[in-house]
Swiss-Prot record:
This is Protein argonaute-3. It is found in: Cytoplasm, P-body. Belongs to the argonaute family. Ago subfamily. Keywords: Acetylation, Cytoplasm, Endonuclease, Hydrolase, Metal-binding, Nuclease, Phosphoprotein, Ribonucleoprotein, RNA-binding, RNA-mediated gene silencing, Translation regulation, Ubl conjugation. Its main location: cytoplasm. SUPFAM superfamilies: PAZ domain, Ribonuclease H-like. It comes from Homo sapiens (Human). Its EC number is 3.1.26.n2. The keyword Magnesium does not apply.
């Protein structure tokens, strides 16, 4: 992949993504199967046509119906026996050219509409170019280099896109497509999630170029859809109403707001017009019930009168509303005042839920979808057999052959690093299957805690004083064993209630106890108090806080207390453990800074909240201590807008902490999808360089830019049962793959660095987009695996390198800093809580960390 010049005069050099420097050899070989299936493609040219459908802006489903109807209708004159494939937008491919003039052809197509009304469309088809699969073979086998991919080159001329469209054509007609997955309504089984939502199962399918061949990646997939049901039932599920007939009163304000939030944007169909099931999109819920909600009705004599919705339905449809006390749905355009009583509407089937699931729904979803690795492997194999690609007429038309057995891959299990602890006996821990423990070990550098406070936001009934006393005694014992002694009793221990009391209490503590190191906050479950504690502690007063759920105070376990100590020690400037120095890769021989970066976006369907960009940087040579920077930026923008100034801040902090200037920058970037690689790399690599040059004009450290991806569907399974690990039968921690299923010539690899506990482990995918430091495959794979062992919050190796994980935590914490107190106290009648309508300066200030907290790992 190459990046076209985009400078003022096109002066920027082409950025060539590095080629693979060779293959890794370290580690113990392991035989694996991957859910990738080889696709054999003929060495032919296919023909690309541009399709233009008017009226445009129709959903892809409708476009597909139009094209399907067109192919049937013009079979004799144009299409003959050809079976074109279509991507649902503007690209149509055929195996043989169509008899159309170079200027194109215009066709009229009609689809049957609702209620006997036909829908007319105008379709124009125009030849664009040939697409060569012969060239694709040459690139896959390494015989020719691909031409530079310019930023503005259309995807439709890409031969890989053509392969993808062929394989997706039939499933797109049969199922409900969502992204790269296909779903169908549950038949004979039911997986309700509550709140009017349910689980639909389906499969993911995507085509990827691999070494010497094209691979089809197939995986089982599940997502939440809205249940097709009467709107009244939907409302009852959302509001936890067990029997609507026992609710003769109108909805309360807070109920109406909650219901509006859930149903807004959904499609409903009406039931009061016989077979004419007209569909509408909901834009609001009325404040007034159907018995009082009025609208201007035009009579036959031209006069306009006010009618209530209930009256209108009685007069027009002789329908006496059963629930006139309930509100109406406002549908279509806001200004048009179209109202429908809830009882004549059903939720339209097949609508995917894009809104965020609640915690309960998420946990139900995980339980319904988690499969042990062997079960998932079996399910995927079943899927591929039932997909029966050899009978797919479109796959046949283009002469594809899809193998129905998983790809055999040889991976390697990398050696785990040893971890150095402190104390008198300076013990070393050796992880086994990605896990180790603290028993008999002390922190590498433990903090002594002399002055600390407790604020209990659980009630005295929930958490009596003797329970608190027991908890502090246990915590002090475990902290002493861990080498982080908490001395004496807390200087302050009080009960408090509600988020409003956080700030005054913390101010009192700050003013009264100089040298206060830590406030332990006890929370009564999920509460707005948490966000307020973090806002006041992190941004307003600069005080270290550690929250604990009351259930863990009432019933203490050594494991929970030990995990608390891991977090507390780091927040107060301690070091839990370090990588044993002699086993680290050679990149550590000179000063090096590790950066992790992530952007988190607001939940789908929320256009007002900003996206949050976070970048963290290591501050020592181990690397164990990190410093954070965070910014708010335009919603849904993936590029980190202010990266240059964030990296500059971190380089300055690194210099202050170590008195060295890094000669190398290793940048792990989370959350970028393949389609965005080029734009993001182009902007961000230049921003990192700009940060360096702004400090000293000749300062040019070597930069390595690595994208970390977890949101992909490649899964690896042990070919030999005896190699499976744990109850879920997963691949061992440290399993690495950089052959067969990886990119034909770019530098990428899969690494599963964690031990799978539930379900099937998902290996992380690493793609090196820039490398001034000329890493070998072994060096970078080992470095990445070692960094997965340096995450301070647990004694396990995690699934992505610590810096990338910390960036995610920092961005997540900033979401809490943005919560408005006044909005979040309860579900009031105003729009719920975050950062709505606040100006950019106020948002930027809200996520700004207090000077005293800035250099600590407050996010741990």
């Amino acid at each position: 992949m190459e990046i076209g010049s985009a400078g003022p005069a096109g002066a920027q050099p082409l950025l060539m993504v590095p080629r693979r420097p060779g293959y890794g050899t370290m580690g113990k070989p392991i035989k694996l199967l991957a859910n990738c299936f080889q696709v054999e493609i003929p060495k032919i040219d296919v023909y690309l046509y541009e399709v233009d459908i008017k009226p445009d802006k129709c959903p892809r489903r409708v476009n597909r119906e139009v094209v399907d109807s067109m192919v049937q209708h013009f079979k004799v004159t144009i299409f003959g026996d050809r079976r074109p494939v279509y991507d649902g937008k503007r690209s149509l491919y055929t195996a043989n050219p169509l008899p159309v003039a170079t200027t194109g052809v215009d066709l009229d197509v009609t689809l049957p509409g609702e209620g006997g009304k036909d829908r007319p469309f105008k379709v124009s088809i125009k030849f664009v170019s040939r697409v060569s699969w012969h060239l694709l073979h040459e690139v896959l086998t390494g015989r020719t280099l691909p031409e530079p991919l310019e930023l503005d080159k259309p995807i439709s001329t890409n031969p890989v896109h053509a392969v993808d469209v062929v394989l997706r054509h039939l499933p797109s007609m049969k199922y409900t497509p969502v992204g790269r997955s296909f779903f169908s309504a549950p038949e004979g089984y039911d997986h309700p999630l509550g709140g009017g939502r349910e689980v639909w199962f389906g499969f993911h399918q995507s085509v990827r170029p691999a070494m010497w061949k094209m691979m089809l990646n197939i995986d089982v997939s599940a997502t939440a859809f809205y249940k097709a049901q009467p709107v009244i039932q939907f409302m009852c599920e959302v509001l936890d109403i067990h029997n609507i007939d026992e609710q003769p009163r109108p909805l309360t304000d807070s109920h109406r707001v909650k219901f509006t939030k859930e149903i807004k944007g959904l499609k409903v169909e009406v039931t009061h017009c016989g077979t004419m099931r007209r569909k509408y999109r909901v834009c609001n819920v009325t404040r007034r019930p159907a018995s009082h909600q009025t609208f201007p009705l035009q009579l036959e004599n031209g006069q306009t009168v006010e009618r209530t919705v209930a009256q209108y339905f009685r007069e027009k449809y002789t329908l006496q509303l059963k629930y006139p006390h309930l509100p109406c749905l406002q549908v279509g355009q806001e200004q048009k005042h179209t109202y429908l009583p809830l009882e004549v509407c059903n939720i339209v089937a097949g609508q995917r839920c894009i809104k965020k699931l609640t915690d309960n729904q998420t946990s139900t979803m995980i339980k319904a979808t988690a499969r042990s690795a062997p079960d998932r492997q079996e399910e995927i194999s079943r899927l591929v057999r039932s997909a029966n690609y050899e009978t797919d007429p479109f796959v046949q038309e283009f002469q594809f052959k899809v193998r129905d057995e998983m790809a055999h891959v040889t991976g390697r299990v990398l050696p785990a690093p040893m971890l150095q602890y402190g104390g008198r006996n300076r013990t070393v821990a050796t992880p086994s299957h990605g896990v180790w423990d603290m028993r008999g070990k002390q922190f590498h550098t433990g903090v002594e805690i002399k002055m600390w406070a407790i604020a209990c936001f659980a009630t005295q009934r929930q958490c009596r004083e003797e329970i608190l006393k027991g908890f502090t005694d246990q915590l002090r014992k475990i902290s002493k064993d861990a080498g982080m002694p908490i001395q004496g009793q807390p200087c302050f221990c009080k009960y408090a209630q509600g988020a409003d009391s956080v700030e005054p209490m913390f101010r009192h503590l700050k003013n009264t106890y100089s040298g206060l190191q830590l406030i332990i906050v006890i929370l009564p479950g999920k509460t707005p108090v948490y966000a307020e504690v973090k806002r006041v502690g992190d941004t307003l007063l600069g005080m270290a806080t550690q929250c604990v759920q009351v259930k863990n105070v009432i019933k203490t376990s050594p494991q929970t207390l030990s995990n608390l100590c891991l977090k507390i020690n780091v927040k107060l400037g301690g070091i839990n453990n370090i990588l044993v120095p002699h086993q680290r890769p050679s990149v550590f021989q000179q000063p090096v800074i590790f950066l992790g970066a992530d952007v988190t976006h607001p939940p789908a369907g929320d256009g007002k909240k900003p996206s949050i960009a976070a970048v963290v940087g290591s501050m020592d040579a181990h690397p164990s201590r990190y410093c954070a920077t965070v910014r708010v930026q335009r919603p849904r923008q993936e590029i980190i807008q202010d990266l240059a100034s964030m990296v500059r801040e971190l380089l300055i902090q690194f210099y202050k902490s170590t008195r060295f200037k890094p000669t190398r920058i290793i940048f792990y970037r989370d959350g970028v999808s393949e389609g965005q690689f080029r734009q993001v790399l182009y902007y961000e690599l230049l921003a990192i360089r700009e940060a360096c040059i702004s400090l000293e004009k000749d300062y040019q450290p070597g930069i390595t830019y690595i994208v970390v991806q977890k949101r992909h569907h490649t899964r690896l399974f042990c070919a030999d049962r005896t190699e499976r690990v744990g109850r879920s039968g997963n691949i061992p921690a440290g399993t690495t793959v950089d052959t067969d299923i990886t990119h034909p010539y770019e530098f990428d690899f899969y690494l599963c660095s964690h031990a799978g506990i539930q379900g099937t482990s998902r290996p992380s995918h690493y793609h090196v987009l820039w490398d001034d430091n000329c890493f070998t495959a072994d060096e970078l794979q080992l470095l990445t695996y070692q960094l997965c062992h340096t995450y301070v919050r647990c004694t396990r190796s995690v699934s992505i390198p610590a810096p990338a994980y910390y960036a995610h935590l920092v961005a997540f914490r900033a979401r809490y800093h943005l919560v408005d107190k006044e909005h979040d106290s309860a579900e009031g009648s105003h729009v719920s809580g975050q950062s709505n309508g606040r100006d950019p300066q106020a948002l930027a200030k809200a996520v700004q960390i207090h000077q005293d907290t800035l250099r600590t790992m407050y996010f741990a």
